[in-house]
Amino acid sequence: AKDYQDNIYKGFMNALDDPYSCYYTADEYQPLMESTSGSYEGIGVVVSQNVQTKIITVVRPFEGCPGAEAGMLPGDILIEVAGNDVSGIDVSTVVSWIKGEGGTTVDIRVYRESEDKYYDFTVERRKIEVPTVAYEMLEDNIGYVQVTEFDEVTSDQYIAAVDDLKAQGMEGLIVDIRDNPGGLLSCVVDMLDYMLPE
């Protein structure tokens, strides 16, 4: 009966013919909220899967997070996670093995091609705040802020970045949102309110 009800609601939304309106079940809504919260419990490592080979590689360990602190590096190839061979396994499944309750640990084996060596890590999970803002001061006191996505944590990170650049004597600002997949409208509104208070 619940599936029938969900399908009715989905049908209503589809009938609107609006690309920005849709219905989510509780199971579909949970990962969506996690993806836009900007925080999760895990080890703070971005991984990517090659479509052809299915090899999963570390793209970027977040600075100051457990994965980086353990010694994981960009380019490391995942071999095993939590005792499971990851060969041919979908990346979303592997990520679900890596994530877990803060304070628990996960065993990860990687192959580092540049050294032709295998490394074993036992990494303690903790709450990770995803860094969605990077910034620097360019020549002529021009501040540069890159925003990679609009999550719950982004507006605070953006305001902190702009405040720091102002303290350094910023006279102009470039906000780079290229390749930003989007996210929360409320975050964008908060950022614009800060930039354009009137």
Over which residues does each language-model region extend?
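Residue-level recognition of conserved structural "scaffold" positions that shape functional pockets
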Residues: 49-51, 78, 190
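Generic hydrophobic, aliphatic-rich segments that mediate packing or membrane embedding
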Residues: 28, 39-41, 74, 90, ...
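Cleft-lining beta-strand/loop regions that shape enzyme active-site pockets
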Residues: 57-60, 68-73, 80-85, 92-198
